[in-house]
Structure formats: C-alpha cells, structure tokens
Amino acid sequence: MEVNNRVVVGMSGGVDSSVTAYLLKEQGFEVIGVTMRVWVDPYGKARDDDKSCCSLKAIHDAKKVAEILGIPHYTVNLSEVFYDKIVKYFIDEYLKGRTPNPCVFCNRFIKFGDLLEKAHELGAYYIATGHYVRKEYDEDRKRYLLKKGLDFKKDQSYMLYRLTQEQLKHALFPLGNYTKEEVRALAEKIGLPVADKRESQEICFIPDNDYKAFIKRQIKKDVKPGEFRDIHGNFLGYHKGIINYTIGQRKGLGLSSDRPLYVVDIDPENNVVIVGHQEDVWGEELISSNNNFISIEKLEEEIKVTAKIRYTAKEDEAIIKPYGDDKVLVRFLRPQRAITPGQSVVFYDGDVVVGGGIIEKKVR
C-alpha cells in the first residue's frame, strides 16, 4: 500500500485514544475511529461500567467522541479471534503453573495485528493508539525504534516489546511526548466527555479481577489439588491447585511455619508447589524464550542492557547473551525478587526498547 494520510485510530472509549484521534485530525490526517470489541462474557460476568475497555459503555463513549470530532467510527467484533489467540493462551499458561501477561500478546496480534488489517481494508496506511511511547526510524540500523514515552510514570513500552518492524512502520503514537495530566487537560479544553474517565486497571476479560474463578468456568471443572513441598523435597501439606499460586506469593498458602513461607517454584508435571523462605524467592539469572527484538534484528553476542521482569518492576542492569536454540540467558547484576515464568522480561538501551521475551525459568 502506498503511503497516504488516512489513519485508523483504535478507540477504546478512554481519554488517551480520544485525544489521539483529536491530535491526528489537528495534524491534517484523515482519521477513522475503530473500536474492537474483543470480549463478550458468555456467563454475563463482564463489567459494563466505565472502567472496562470491552463494555457497551466504552463503545458508546468512543462513538460519542467520534461524533464530536466529526470522524467516522466503526465497531469490529473480534471476540472469536481474541478467544483463540489470547484467552486460550492465558488459561493454558495458568494450567501449566505459569503466570502470563496476556496484554503483550493482545497488543501484537489484536491491537496492532488485526487493527492493521482493518486499516488496510479501509484504505488507511497508518494505525494509531493512545499508548505512551515514541517511535523513530534509525537510518544507520535501517530499523524502526520503539522508545519510552516522555512521561516515564505512564510509559507503556514494556507492553509493546513484541511489535514487529512492519507494525511499527505503520504505527503512530501521538501521546509519546505528552504527560497524562496534559492529555486530560487537553481533553477537557476541547470538551470531550471522557476527560475525567477512570482508567481500566484489570485484565479486560477477567470479571472483578478473579482469574481463578474465570479459569474454572472456562475449563468447566475443578483444578486438581496437589502437594506443597519445601526446597529440599519435604512434604508440607496439600495445595488447592496450581492455578491459585504464583512465584513470590505468601498469602493464602495455609501452611504453618516458624518463618514466613513463600512460593518459590511450581512443578506442573508433578502438580507440586515448592515453598521456601524470603531469601529463596530472589534470583540473578533467567532464561527467556519466544524472544522478539526491535532495535536489533537478532541477538548475536553478549550485550549490557537494563531489564525488568514485570510491568511494575524497576529496571536493573543486566547482561544478555544468546542461549541455545533462540533463547536468551539474562544475568542481572543484582538479585531480583520473584522471577516468574510466563511473565515478560524486557531489555532497554537507555530509553530504547532492545527487545524481550517470555521468562521460561529462573536459573539461579
């Protein structure tokens, strides 16, 4: 497709995507709003309040903003593909004793994958979202770079580390140079009804943030209980099913001990949850798989980066190097708490996203 000034904005009904659409229209783009309804709860548990990005209220808000801005708006039902690509993955990971982050895959396959397809159907070269990140093209590397948003408190680059060069080529991020406060102020100034709308904090398809109940409803059976063992293999008691536990967890174990106990590992093959003390939760090395690189095509040698092992974690210095078959060995210079299989580890060079992968296991 030839470059043109038509852009499809993924509109969630929130303030960020609404201001994104406004800014692009002000810049002279031909803006089309598209809201993707990715989740319709068959059990009727899904929230329909203003916090849920999948609710009817969210669709109504997006349409209202589009009317105010004078742009066309479409709603696309992607619930089936979302279930196949994201929800099944989420459930399978928990049943394997891992703690997934479905949002990173939703961004890759739905918000930037399916949205880009829809954009091309509508004759648009570009897609845009309300993420707080920046993009630039590096002439020397001949690659598009993903950079942190200037508002480091709202930076969402961790969630977008799986984007491809093709997706970045077509992506626009107007909010990358704004703070959240500036975005809300602008929305209020231009009279958008979502200026003070609360942000959605939970996973969009998990009612009341109760993922355990969600999984049980989806698999239509109870999870199998198993054994608690300590790091030396000693039997300590019985657990209620591995989906109820994550690395670093202390509450809800139901075990008595003279010192606090924490989940330090999960053995899904034997249905065993391994517990230890606070010092056993920390680690310095991990292996990541299913890696995706942005600033480089492939990791071919050892490099020094900063990295973080979950969205809310602080970055810390680390060395990454190729390991076996397309895996990466990550060695932190300082111990990290609760290295959790299934979560993403993301690598940075300053404010540039190098890449990242899914944590496979803690090495030590």
Swiss-Prot record:
**For this protein, what reaction is catalysed?**
S-sulfanyl-L-cysteinyl-[protein] + uridine(34) in tRNA + AH2 + ATP = 2-thiouridine(34) in tRNA + L-cysteinyl-[protein] + A + AMP + diphosphate + H(+)
Residues that coordinate or bind ATP: G10, M11, S12, G13, G14, V15, D16, S17, M36, G130
Going by the UniProt record, its keywords in alphabetical order are:
ATP-binding, Cytoplasm, Disulfide bond, Nucleotide-binding, RNA-binding, Transferase, tRNA processing, tRNA-binding
Query: Annotated site (Interaction with tRNA), which positions?
Result: H131, Q343
Offer an example of a GO molecular function term for this protein. Answer: tRNA binding
For biological process, the GO terms are: tRNA wobble position uridine thiolation
What pairs make up the disulfide bonds?
C106-C204
Q: Where in the cell is it found?
A: Cytoplasm
The active site lies at C106 (nucleophile), C204 (cysteine persulfide intermediate)
Coiled-coil positions: none
Annotated region (Interaction with tRNA), positions in chain: 154-156, 310-311
**GO CC annotation terms, alphabetical:** cytoplasm
Recorded hits in InterPro entries, A to Z, give:
MnmA-like (IPR004506), MnmA-like_C (IPR046885), MnmA-like_central (IPR046884), MnmA-like_central_sf (IPR023382), Rossmann-like_a/b/a_fold (IPR014729)
EC category:
transferase
The record's section on SUPFAM superfamilies has: Adenine nucleotide alpha hydrolases-like
Top-rank taxon of the source lineage equals Bacteria
Q: Which family does it belong to?
A: Belongs to the MnmA/TRMU family.
Name the PANTHER family on file.
MITOCHONDRIAL TRNA-SPECIFIC 2-THIOURIDYLASE 1, TRNA 5-METHYLAMINOMETHYL-2-THIOURIDYLATE -METHYLTRANSFERASE
* Family annotation (NCBIfam families): PRK00143.1 (NF001138), trmU (TIGR00420)
Name listed for the protein in its UniProt record = tRNA-specific 2-thiouridylase MnmA 1
Q: What gene name is given for the protein in this entry? A: mnmA1
